[in-house]
């Protein structure tokens, strides 16, 4: 955690030729654009496999561990970014304007009049890296596995929950029959896997896909090696239908300490570093051969409360503080949080104060609470709310309804400096209410999270242009089947009204009506107090301009490089000083851009659906 394109919408014949021509000119203009229109950075090292010249290696520093290479279960942002490089998706977001769709594995599509049957044409020029052809049967098998195997639903089950039947009448035709209309049918942000490989996997839920290399895929890169918490290595897929990447190797190298990653960038040991702190970004400003990219963020950063962990079978588990079951208590906590201070002091201006659930980058879905509804910073009101709700203060300590002092456990990510910095403020602000806060920062927050063993936690998901996945995280269907299972739930929310609104928005094809429903969902989520958005942090990243000549940001204006809804950044990247080599074989040069233009022309000719796609883990937990 998607796109727009033909389908249930009226096709407009007039203007298509003009629009296509304009789009071609726009994209051709991209080719001639100065380097400032892109990001830059890459490195060179040993000789190429053929012994000719030096090998161009693009090295990306990452802080988040890649816990699995299984596309059915990957939800971490680091892992879902790898999936986009390894496997093709049915459709792609346009890198210049993510509100538009481009063909991916599917070259075109159509829908029945009742919008319940979707037929996709699967391209005939895609090949698995082991030499076998990609067919519609691979896509049908992928979706059917997700429909019938609970383990395979973990990452993207929301896409198939409404599927009735998926078939492949022939190698080039995929047919999906729905139970009811579904607005995300051009946003099926699902990695399609090779049936002949995955049918051999006995337990999808436990399979990590990290033992046999290279991993068979059909994306722009082929994963050749992985060592947990050390690196992930890729080589370019020379047979990728959109054109081979220009770099000889792409390496994601793990740095637990982001200061060490920044130091490596300065030394030229890595090409690119994401998720910079304000201090790190400031230290790089003006540095030779280094460019800092400060892009509008596509994720939210929030506080999530434990509302009482439970499973679909009704069993409760975990050990969340019982005071958090009280909406007034939750609201009081958030009245004591000064979001402006968080933005000014922790983010140092590299972000926007939190309000609704969807970041302001997505204007159609961005929601603000009314003045009367807003949980504004007001410590006096927070204290009054606690008093009124029965949480009295005695001797400077806030007591629960059993007369015991309240201590809350705050869980944070050890690899995220923002969490650590913000926790100090929260401890102070809640301490003024008489509530003690014990902060624990962990390398892996996943285990206590799924076990429901926390009170409050720092939470964050990347949001795609279509918000379906981050909304699905809070439905009853996202709960684990039993306490021993892992669901897609973010923090165990299950509410009939929210579920009803979710069902309405997924079935609504009218963009404005759907957006209104989504905003109603955001309003409910805000009022519930189950979670509260602190801020929308910018994507602050840096790269070496003496290593990468050009790289595509998404969107083109004020866009990010890391965590895109697609593979555009690494696929398009061109080595500095290697123009002749980079342009051969049609990588990220003019031929590739023209290829995107041609694909966009196809999309324009088919129709324009409002974007409905999901993730880079689209909406992946961070």
Question: Predicted segment positions?
Answer:
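Alpha-helical secondary-structure segments
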Residues: 135-142, 173-177, 219-220, 248-249, ...
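Ligand-site clamp/hinge motif
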Residues: 237-284, 427, 436-438
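Surface-exposed binding/hinge segments that line
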Residues: 50-53, 121, 155-201
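Detector for C-terminal structural segments
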Residues: 2, 41-44, 227, 334-367, ...
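N-terminal lobe/hinge region of extracytoplasmic solute-binding protein
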Residues: 61-113, 144, 216
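Aromatic- and charge-enriched surface segment that lines or borders ligand/interaction sites
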Residues: 107-152, 175, 261-264, 322-324
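Short, well-ordered beta-strand elements
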Residues: 54-64, 107, 117-120, 139-143, ...
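Gly/Pro-rich hinge or "lid" segments in bacterial periplasmic/extracellular proteins
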Residues: 96, 190-245, 249, 379-380, ...
